[in-house]
Every structure is written in structure tokens, then in C-alpha cells.
Amino acid sequence: MTNYYFIGIKGTGMASLALILHDQGNKVLGSDIDKETFTQFPLVKAGIQITDFDPDLIKSNYVVVKGNAFSDDHPQVLAAKKVGAKLLTYPQAVEEVIRRHFSIAVSGAHGKTSTTSLLAHILSNFESTSYLIGDGVGKGVFSSKYFVVEADEYDRHFQPFTPDVAIITNIDWDHPDYYKSLDDVKSAFSEFADHVKKIIFAYGEDPEIKKIKPKTARILSYGFEKSDYFCANNIDKRTEGSYFSLSKGGRKLGDFFATIEGDHGILDTTAAIAVADYLGFSVDQIQKGLLTYQGAKRRFNISQVADLTIVDDYAHHPTEIKATIDAARQKFPNKRLVAVFQPHTYTRVNAFKDEYVNALKSADKVYITPIFGSLREKAGNAKSEDILDKLPNAGAIISESNAYDKLSAEHGSVLVFMGAGDIEKYEDALKKGFE
């Protein structure tokens, strides 16, 4: 048994890893801010202690895992160095865990969490599987055959990973506070691909992915084109989900149904099916997994309050926003769609304000909250009005105090809440207004 201490244990990846190491019989505790987050509830349920940032809590026999948002001069990091504790970054800690198993890393600018979650679910139904998902979910089985991990490109966090198999869902410019251009992003994915040992399943219609030439792994494409090795075709999108056929190497693999919406949902599902097929799972096994899948946290989660339908989604990049609104159109074809968007980081708003406008235009009406910063970026020269003022379908800037008054008036509509920050507080304010 090893003693692990996580600095920033409520982070989505950190919470997942903490749960995995706890499941594997280790002692786990960690520190974070007092603010309530959705990731803390599984930690509390597992009996994992969450402390403040007191440096005296760090012991020499701990393996200290430093969250990505914490600098080397953080008091607890300095304390770990002072007492001689083993100190790992989050990516280094993940690599130490996954190297003990046959590992599948899911990467990409968009769709990582949904694809990781679905693949982990399919495999877990029929084989002992550990997984680490970016929605704060993690499960660790010490002797598991497979380990499915979400591989985050931010700050090149996925560079230490050496997976047996990988998925690359797409390459797009995001995280403008770190990546300065699309070429910069592509170079990071190229480095990641060079570390994959066996095979990469990659979206075949992505022009940047086509430029990647891995040192060792071979690439099999998936997508909607006949030239893709795994080709989704005969697609029938309905309100209950999507029906489609899948061909493999020009021959029919099988017919599938999944409770997913939009082209992006079909692509993510195709990627998961391709990996499961490669690992030897049958079409029947895969379809059973698809039928019992209930989705990932904050990925198109649907609820109801009064006469309003609520969709909660993590979308925060223009590409993701457009995909989420398109998915809502498929699910609710006869409903009015009202987007409630929380911009995430000032650098994103500065870099993508026009793209946000174009994506949000596809909703019937748009409300925007103030910008959510981050631990790395708490202020900037952008503002939410930079987006709202350019929208022909603009509503208003909403706050916790006016969320109920503004949104409850959208009778019979679908409210699509999108954001990667704390947008749940606006949903909660709306729901409390009905109590």
C-alpha cells in the first residue's frame, strides 16, 4: 500500500486518479479549495479526506501528486521537496499507473470524455477494466486487463503517456493561453502519436491528423467516407438516438444503435467500436454495451424543471457549441432552443469571439453569463458583451440573481446550458426559483 497526497484533488483528472488509486488499495487524501464541485462527491463517498493547503500535512512517506494548476512554489509543493517526499506531476502519476496494464489513450481537441466514457463502459461489461475519465470518474482494478485513459493535450500533459493503443478524435486550435497556433497543437499531437506502441484510430477527414506520421504505430481511419477503414453509413438520426451501419475494410461489420445525437456522437461511437473490435469484442457484445450506456457527466445531460427542458453540457469551444446545439435540434426537433453560455477564460474569448458568434447563431435565443476565468487566468481585457452584442438572437447577460426571472420566461423551451466553469450555479438558481 502506498500513501498518496493530491494537491488539487478536486480537479477532474486528479479526482479520477485519486479514486483509481483508492480502489487499488492505497491510502489517498488531498487538498483543495473549499468551493463545492461536482468532482468532490465521489471522493467523499469513497471516504477520501479533503484538507486545506496546510504544508505541515505533507509527510516524507507520501507520494505527492501535483495538480496541473499548481506551481512549483506552492507551499505544499515546497513542503514535499523539503521533507523528501516523492513528487509527481499529474501526467507522470497517470503514466506510472497505466503502464501496468494494456492501455488505450483517448486524445483529441473535442470528444475525449464522451469517447473515453463509452469505450470504458463497453469493455467493462465483459472484461476487467480500469479507467480514468475527464469528468471526475475513475475506477481502479489492480489486476485489470485494460486501462482506458483520457489524454489531455493542454500544456502537453499527454506527452509522458506511452499507450498501447490510442484514439485521436480531431485536432483543433484550443487553449490559446498555451498553444499559439494550430501548427503548435498539431506538433503536440505528433509527439503524442510517436509514443503510441501499436495502433492509432484517427478521424479520417481531419486534415491535421492526415499530416501525422507516427514513428511506430500504424493508423487506421474512421469516419463517414468510403475511404475510411471504419466507415459509418446508412445513418438514421431520430429523437431516441442514432441508427447506423459500420463497415470495416470495405466489408460490413454490423448494424448499431446508440442513444447519441449529432455527427460528433456517431464519430465518437465509431471510434469506441473500432477499438473494441480490435481488442476482439464481438458485434453483439459491443451493441449490448451501447444499449446500457448512460452517458458521461456534463455531456448532454437532460433534466426537466416545470415546463422547461434542461440540457447540461461541458461545451466551451465554438466547435463544441455548434455540435451541442445541432444535437439538441436532433433530440428536440419541434422545440425552441435557448442557449445559456458561460465563456471559459478570457484568452478564449479574445481568440474565438467571432467563432462563438457563428456557433451561437444556430440557437433561437442566447443568454450569456460573465466570463469564467481559471486559476491560471483570473482577469483579462475581454468581456461577455464582446459576443452578445454581435448576436442577432441575443437575450441578455444573466447572473445568479436574475437567472430565474429571465429563463423561467422562456416557457416550453429547451435551455441548453454550456460551459466548462461553474455554470451549474445558474441552473441551480433557476431551479430554486421554482421551489
From Swiss-Prot:
Q: Which GO terms describe its molecular function?
A: ATP binding; UDP-N-acetylmuramate-L-alanine ligase activity
Which Pfam families would you find in this protein's record? Mur_ligase, Mur_ligase_C, Mur_ligase_M
* Pathway participation: Cell wall biogenesis; peptidoglycan biosynthesis
Q: Where is this gene product found?
A: Cytoplasm
One Gene Ontology term, aspect cellular component:
cytoplasm
**InterPro entries this protein is in?**
Mur-like_cat_sf (IPR036565), Mur_ligase_C (IPR004101), Mur_ligase_C_dom_sf (IPR036615), Mur_ligase_cen (IPR013221), Mur_ligase_N (IPR000713), MurCDEF_pg_biosynth (IPR050061), UDP-N-AcMur_Ala_ligase_MurC (IPR005758)
From the UniProt record, list the reaction(s) this protein catalyses. Answer: UDP-N-acetyl-alpha-D-muramate + L-alanine + ATP = UDP-N-acetyl-alpha-D-muramoyl-L-alanine + ADP + phosphate + H(+)
The family database entries (HAMAP family) matched by this protein are listed as:
MurC
Family (UniProt): Belongs to the MurCDEF family.
The molecule here is called UDP-N-acetylmuramate--L-alanine ligase
Q: Which organism is it from?
A: Oenococcus oeni (strain ATCC BAA-331 / PSU-1)
